[in-house]
Swiss-Prot record:
Name this polypeptide is given: Porphobilinogen deaminase
Catalytic activity: 4 porphobilinogen + H2O = hydroxymethylbilane + 4 NH4(+)
Pathway: Porphyrin-containing compound metabolism; protoporphyrin-IX biosynthesis; coproporphyrinogen-III from 5-aminolevulinate: step 2/4
UniProt key word Lipid biosynthesis: no
Listed HAMAP family: Porphobil_deam
Gene Ontology CC terms: cytoplasm
Native source species: Nocardia farcinica (strain IFM 10152)
């Protein structure tokens, strides 16, 4: 019998960084507020112990250790930054809750309070994400893009110390650790589409733990789930990993139908880019939130028709484990085949 049924504290697995523990802490606090005792358990991951770029150390490096502990039963649930999860399904687990999302936009933190358009040509801007690198280069500002790893504090320090003129990071991370005051510009999606699922958390547990799945469902936000499902379906259909130069942002918005009634629609924007910024393909779609996964796949197919595969194949070929023994790029599968009870598997 699981902790959810016995009343013993639920053990929440998390990485040990300030950001990860703050994120997991919001889940712990929500469970405690609902009358379910919970505590954090810190798990070391290979990603925390490596200074290599994420695209070199591999997809899932921040989540595999948490899943190992979850499978072993040493924790009852794990809290992930959803964008770090591989799209490949794992039938042992289920995403039982996706809490309300933080602002998914990227943020610029620059010296002297500068915004992106005020940075001089040759300014050193730190980021290692190919998606950000590609979109920054595509703006044609002549910036010098510098590789960047480390926790948020160490990234910000490289600007304060004068080593870099600016860094680009997820706004959600700064918000969660109370550092939004350092943001000099929130980058609008028209400038830079965020990573699929950026700003969203995934609360994962074992698929056979029915009582815990039911308990965690109370934390689920339907609009966030629909948006994340659409964005990750697009990523999976493009056969791209979480480090590929792919951006996506979905939002549930209200509109009027033909009879003047207010209805909810899912608006999804996506892009695929060449890492050198020479080309960025963009497309968008609007549809029923209940068809979120289908909309994501449809938009991905539109991007593929525009030439996205040719832009992404070079990046896919360099990711660890990206090639099969035949030399062909191995397509990852979408995790939507293992939905929670609240997720539309279409």
């Amino acid at each position: 019998m699981g902790a959810a049924a016995t009343g013993t504290p639920l053990r929440i697995g998390t990485r040990g960084s300030l950001l990860a523990m703050t994120q997991a802490g919001t889940v712990r606090d929500a469970l405690i507020a609902a009358g379910r005792p919970a505590e954090l358990v810190v798990v070391k991951t290979p990603g925390d112990m490596s200074s290599d770029p994420v695209q070199k150390i591999g997809v899932g490096v921040f989540t595999s250790a948490l899943r190992d502990e979850l499978a072993a039963g040493t924790i009852d649930l794990a809290v992930h930054s959803y964008k770090d999860l591989p799209t490949a399904p794992d039938p042992r687990f289920v995403i039982a809750a996706i809490p309300p999302r933080e602002d998914p936009r990227d943020a610029l933190v620059a010296r002297d309070g500068l915004v992106l358009g005020e940075l001089p040509a040759g300014a050193k801007v730190g980021t290692s994400a190919p998606r950000r690198v590609a979109q920054l280069r595509a703006l044609g500002l002549g910036l010098d893009i510098v590789p960047l790893r480390g926790n948020l504090d160490s990234r910000l320090a490289r600007v304060t110390d004068g080593e870099l003129d600016a860094v680009v990071v997820a706004r959600a991370g700064l918000s969660r650790i109370g550092r939004t005051a350092v943001i000099t510009e929130a980058l609008e999606p028209v400038q830079m589409l965020p990573a699929p699922a950026q700003g969203a958390l995934a609360v994962e547990c074992r698929s056979e733990d029915a009582a815990l799945i039911e308990a965690l469902a109370e934390l689920d936000d339907a609009a966030t789930r629909a948006a994340v499902v659409a964005e990750r379906a697009l990523l999976a259909e493009l056969e791209a990993g979480c480090t590929a130069p792919v951006g996506a942002l979905a939002e549930v918005v209200e509109s009027l139908d033909d009879d003047g009634r207010i209805v909810e629609e899912l608006s999804l924007r996506g892009c695929a880019a060449a890492v050198d910024g020479s080309e960025v393909l963009r497309a968008s779609v609007v549809g029923d939130p209940e068809r979120a996964a289908e909309l994501g796949r449809a938009l991905a197919r539109e991007l593929l028709e525009l030439g996205a595969r040719e832009l992404l194949v070079e990046v896919a070929a360099t990711e660890p484990g990206a090639r099969s023994g035949t030399g062909a790029v191995r397509p990852p599968e979408t995790d939507l085949s293992n939905p929670s009870p609240m997720e539309n598997p279409q």
